[in-house]
């Protein structure tokens, strides 16, 4: 009877340890995948492609066009600004 109890307890311990090990492996793989995805996103965000997309979007935006029109009007009509850095570029 004692041998059967020891066998059952050791079998249960073995099963629980296998389940725990599998859960840890799954967790480690999940963390590794998230870290890999994060690194790829950071690498993409630092790429020239994203920079070009952002610059193009800013240059084509209505706000930038309006700002350029305001600067042009100021540089044309305000005498003090004609020789400023704002109007030289």
From Swiss-Prot:
The keyword Lipid metabolism appears for this protein: no
Topology relative to the membrane: Single-pass type II membrane protein
Lineage: Viruses, Adnaviria, Zilligvirae, Taleaviricota, Tokiviricetes
GO cellular component terms, A-Z: host cell membrane; membrane
Protein's name according to its UniProt entry: Uncharacterized protein 43
Record localization: Host membrane
Stretches assigned to the Cytoplasmic side: 1
Source organism of the structure: Sulfolobus islandicus filamentous virus (isolate Iceland/Hveragerdi)
Main location: host cell
UniProt entry keywords in alphabetical sequence: Host membrane, Membrane, Transmembrane, Transmembrane helix
Membrane-spanning intervals of the chain: 2-22
Extracellular-facing ranges: 23-89
């Amino acid at each position: 009877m004692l041998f059967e109890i020891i066998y059952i307890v050791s079998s249960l311990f073995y099963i629980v340890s296998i389940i725990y090990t599998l859960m840890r492996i799954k967790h480690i793989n999940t963390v590794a995948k998230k870290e890999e995805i994060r690194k790829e996103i950071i690498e993409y965000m630092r790429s020239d492609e994203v920079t070009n997309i952002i610059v193009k979007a800013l240059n084509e935006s209505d706000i930038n066009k309006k700002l350029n029109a305001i600067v042009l009007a100021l540089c044309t009509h305000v005498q003090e600004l004609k020789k400023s850095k704002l109007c030289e570029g």
